[in-house]
Amino acid sequence: MAPTQRHRWLTLPENRGHRRYRELHRLALDSARSDFEQRHPHARFGPVLALIAAYEEERNIGGVLKDMPTLIGDLEVSTLVVVDGGGDNTAQVATDAGVFTCVLPVNLGQGAALRLGYELAAEHGARFVVTLDADGQNDPTEMPTMLEPLLDGTADFVIASRRLGVDRTTDRFRQAGVQLYAWILNAIVSQRLTDSSNGYRSFRIELLDDIRPHLVQDQYQTAEVVITAASRGWRITQQPTVWHPRASGPSKKGGNLFFGLQYARVILSTWLRVTVGNRRRR
């Protein structure tokens, strides 16, 4: 049976702390790992891995994959798409594009899908990981810019900034939210970031290995990654990039108010967790 037929969208229980949810979560990850091994039994990534978590993006992801570089300098670039459940043909589009594909049988959330990707990156030879969205808002051809601070040894973690670059969207409320939450996050982690919610990021694999056990957010995880990395002393910088409108379809992150409340929740919960953890280590 084809992968897109086997893996249909299911809804897990709402109570994230429920034992049944945790068990289904583990089974879903085990299923995805098995799926990856069946598709790619001898997988070996290039030094640079472009990692995309995708949920029902069959209309958009093909254009992103078409523009993906295969070499940056003398470094080979591999691409891994983690399909986060869904009932469309995202997995088939990725497979047809010839990239590494891993399919979750249920929708766990972007954060959970990316954590799975981080694990696969470490296990299959990647030295640098670049995350970007499946909807066309991040330009894959800007990946050399995102890797530059890692390659020259000046940073461990790079975040793209639409405020330092160009924002081609017209949502003034979302733009104001970007500035507000960057200000809040900077106050917490003593950074000078301008676009902390941007999903276009690059990492040294050593950083991901260090912070991965401390990441718990299944969705709206971008703030959690910044706070966790900063609290553990990793060097963070930013690079100017172009932020494009979605290629097609509505955002999967919800409306501005919902997104803002969820993002604030993640900032607060992560800050409290990191603060308590630091006190206990003392």
Report the location of each language-model feature.
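A conserved acidic beta->alpha catalytic loop
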Residues: V83-A91, G136
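Short beta-strand/loop segment that forms part of the nucleotide-sugar
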Residues: I52, E76-G86, C102
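Short, structured coil segments at secondary-structure junctions
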Residues: D96-G98, R232
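Short, acidic, metal-binding catalytic loop of nucleotide-sugar glycosyltransferases
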Residues: K66-E76
